[in-house]
Amino acid sequence: TPNMDTLAKRGVRFTQFYAAAPVCSPSRAGLLTGRYPVRAGMPGNAGSTKGRAGLAPSEVTIAEMMKATGYATAHIGKWHLGYTPQTMPNGQGFDYSFGHMGGCIDNYSHFFYWQGPNRHDLWRNGKEIFEDGKFFPELMASEAAKFIEQNREKPFFMYFALNVPHYPYQGYAKWLKYYKDLPYPRNLYAAFLSTQDEVIGHLVETVDKLGLRKDTIIIFQSDHGHSHEERAHFG
């Protein structure tokens, strides 16, 4: 993972840095509001069905605060904090949004497969879009690069919520071959982590190419630890 290692070496590494919750939605609510998840109204995961409740519009997010001071704001990637116009990213302070609103998707079909009914879940600024067969993390990197380039002359805040290494573990074929001698399921997880590292490298490369590194703060963290679920090959 050379790109993640470089971020750690060139930056400050926090060894006592805690996520707000052990599952996705409450942790993300804590991250975006700075409040304990229960106080933010998110004690557990938000429903992944359209119309279910999510992060209340009355909660003030970091995107709203940054926007109020003149920053362009973007959400790229996983949301998992609501599926209504009021609770989706554009209703929570983000000028631009691209990604999936539910907890997870297949990275190529962009369908939500957690439980039935299975449905398509890919959105740009509140409108459903279709990018059949395109690897979602690569789409994220491309969308992020466009946003950065368009806003390079002014301050911007980007919430780049990478869905890797969340299941389903769909690493690049070259990494699956590279780790073929590792025992299952470490081979799958290692391939997905190396895939994640490549995507992070593309994002940082964009920042460097545009000469923005000195004026950009990159914070790298996870919303929680690894999963022991069957879908995650029991950890």
Which functions belong to the PLM regions below?
Residues T1-G235:
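Formylglycine-dependent sulfatase
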